[in-house]
Structures are given as C-alpha cells and as structure tokens.
Amino acid sequence: LLAVGWTLGTRSEASSAVFFGYSTLRIALAGGLVLAAVLIFRLTRKSACLSAGLTGFFAVRERVYRALLLLSAALGVLLWSFLFSWLFVPANLRPALLWLIWTVGLAIALLRVGYRGVFRSESFRSHFRIFPRWEAIAPVQKKTMGILLILSLLYLAILIPSNLNGTADLEAFSRYGGDEFVIYPVLMDVMKPGETFGATLYHLFIYEDYHYGYPFYAVSTLLLTPVRLLTGAAFPDRVDLNLPILRMGVSVVPLVLAAWAIVYLFTHFRRPLVSALTLVFLLFAPGSLQNNQGFWHPDGLNLLFVCLSLVFIRRDDERFGRNFYAAAVCVGLSIATRLYGFFFAPAIAVYLIGAVLRKKATWPRAVRAGTIFILVMTLTVALSSPYLFRADARGRMIEILSEKSGEMAHGYEGDFDPRNDYRPGWAAWYPAFEDHYVRMFCFVFLWGSLLTGAFLGNERLTYRTVALWSLTITAYLVFFVAVKSTQYVLPALLPLMGGIFALPLTIEDAGIFSKRTRTAAWLASGAVFAAQLVLNLIRIRPRFF
C-alpha cells in the first residue's frame, strides 16, 4: 500500500496524462500493486493451509535449495533494476521494485530461519559449494598449492619493476604511449562523478567507447576506487599509482590465476613437481610476459574467464549441476569482456551430446541443461553489460564492432606492413605462434599429447574439452583474423601449453602400458619441455637484462 501511495504521489507529465493526471503506465502499476495487496490479504486468511502446503512442498530438501537459489537470483535482478531506474528502467517502477525487493528479501530471511537446520547441514553446503572446503583438500594438493603460491609471489615481485615503466608522471606516460594511453582517459571518465546521481551512473556504466567490454572497466574501477578516495581531485594525474595497480591487478594477477586453473585442469594439484614446472612453462612464455609487462589490457581477465569455464566444465563431469552453470556465467563474462566465449559453442555441444551417448543423461535432460546454460550465459552478458539496455549505446557498440571486425579481417589501414603480416592463413600466423609461444616441434607434441589423452585414461573429458576449445579459437584466428596481436592468442595456446606433461600422465593413468613405455613418455615430455623452455628463456632475456 505504501508503494501504491508512492506511485500515485506525483502526477505524470501533461503530455502522457490520460486519467486524473496519471499516465496509462502509472495507473497500470498502481492497479497491479493494489491487486497484489488483495491477493496477499486473501492468502493471509488461509495461512494455516498455505503453511501446510509449503511444509509439504519443502519436505523435499532439493526444493529448499532451489527456492533459495531462485529467490537470491530474483533479488539480485531486482536490485540491479532499481539501480538502473536512474538510467533506462522506467523511474515509475521504483515503488514496485522496492516493494518486490522487500518481499523477496523477507522471503529469503524467512526461508533461512525456518529451515536453518537444513542450511547449516553439510549436505546443503556441499550442494552449493563451488570450491571444496580446505579440510577436504588432500595433503598433496595443499603442498602443491603452497609451492605454486611461492612461485606466483616471486613472479609478481619480478614483474613489479617493468610495470613501473612510463608511470613517473603524465608526460612519461604520454611518451610510453600504446593502447594504455588511449584507454586511460576512458576509465577516468567512467570514474568521474556527475552533478547528479543519475549522471554519475551514466559515467559509470555508459562509457561510450565499446572496444572492450564493461567487466574490464568494472574491475579497473574497483581496483582504483581506494586511490580515488585518497587522492581526490588529483586522482587522474596519479599515474604513478594508477598504472602499476591496473597493470598488476587487471593483467598480471588474472593471468597468474588463469595459469593456476590450467595447471589444475591437467594435474588436479596432485603432482607437485609437474604442477610447478607447468606453471613456470606457462608464466614465462613470451606471450605471457608480453601481456604482463607494462600492458594494462582486458586479455588477462578474458583468459581467466576462459580457463575457469574449462575448469567448471571438467568439475561438472556431465552431471549438469552447479559447476555447469558456473561455467555458463564464466562464458558469459568472457563474451561481455572480449567476445571469446562465443567460441565455446562446439565444446559445449559435444559435451552435451557426449553425456547422452555415454548414458549419463537423456536427450530431454541434455536439451534442458543446454537451454538453461544459454539462458544463464545470456543473462550474465546482459547484467554485466548494462549499456546494452540503451538504444544509443547499442548503436554505438555495433558501429565500433563493425569497424573493429573490418580491422581484424584486413589489418589497420595506413599501418606500415613490410612483411605482409596483415593477412589470414597458417603461413601468416605460425611465425606469431613461434615467436611468442611454442616452436613447431612443441606445437605438434602438445597436440599429439592432447589427442592421446582424449582417447585414453580417465581424463578424456578434460582433454576433449581443451582440444575442442583450442581448435575452435585457433581456427578462427588463423582463417579469419589478419591482425597478429600477441594477446589474441593467449586463450588459444596457453590452455594447450598446459598439457606439456599430458602424454606421460595419460599413459600412467591408462594403466595398460609397461614401465619402459611410461619412462619413455616422461623422457619425451621432459625433453620437449626443457628445449622449449630454454628457447623461451632466451627469447625473453632482453626483457630483463
């Protein structure tokens, strides 16, 4: 009733008023709220019957879990809608949205109180937990994670000096140049307060330069918010603080986390030495360092979303549960950031079909899971890209993407290209792979190892998913993209490179090969690893000395 009073508290504009000074929308909203109040009143008169019905319904504990999940999702969408009622959601909806937020929030609170025993149970926690409890992690996995943490911290420390380059002041930054100098003013505009709350939201979410998706600017904004609060009006000029934080927080740390995800995919952290060597192999690839030294860009974040998608698909193990839909969220974030998530389509399709063929799911269940996956992915893209809800912003985005797709297909107009690099095809792309990632002998060995794992052992799902992903995105780059930017290849080749020890791991896992064969596989992988690592270290030496 309070929402009804708020809705009718002010008259509509004269141009839209149709009845007693109110617009059709305002009258419809007030009528809907009155109807909701009447229905709620009628339900309260049948509270005993309703309570018994709900008790019977929630006797199946799975329904309690699902109800909490759906109510939480609804509350998130309602809060999002209320926030954006200052931008594109009709302001007249605010009273109704607040009432719904209150109602759904109250329902969640009552559900948590009424079924607190269920929510405190280990079965509930295990049902909703994405990552395992620390106590449930095996000692060897904890040991591996400790080693990886030490290596990662050393890596971050090594990269600090190179990420201070060009950050002394604005003049030094302008000389350093590059994409950062173009993107930085966009971020400063995103973080600039407006004269009104609505104007501030416009700056924050409708940033008008859609070369990169909003998750990139959102993470950058979160990282720099403490600096902005501390430095005040001098904030835009503090490149000595802002740039190192952005480079380390948006480029380096996400890539390191992505490398952890790749290592987990192939070792499950159960092989300390193999895990450590694989992490070093990934982090010291020339392409990784190109991204991690003086380069604030969205590609580290995008790589993290891609690798998390692969991890969640593997953890789901064709059950179509929470991990499968967590993968949908990560795929959506990759799409919202850099569009790469679209290239998961073949891998997801094969994953669904494979579950049916292996009798782990029926066709109707696979179709339902695939449909929900698409819905979750789409909702993630929409909610993480608020500008999509404004027609002018969508038009600007389409214009930019159209222009960018032409550049990707044909190269940057006016650029000096003496080697004729701006062309698609394997002959044009392979030198980029070789210079920044792996030589041909290692490339062939990696694919051979991955395909072996796709047909032998207990990790076939991992290898098939990684192979399909890598093949799809690599084929797109090779045959349709002319620009050879190093960071474009990160999501294609880094997961592939994570399989450097896949051959011996697969042969051991299969349990059908002799000790001599297992030893030969380890020696072969070790030789390829050592040779490629030495070549990469030689390649990256000028970056440090």
Locate the predicted segments by residue.
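Transmembrane alpha-helix segments characteristic
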Residues: 1-2, 64-80, 147-152, 276-283, ...
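Membrane-lumen/periplasm interface segments of specific transmembrane helices
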Residues: 368-413, 531-543
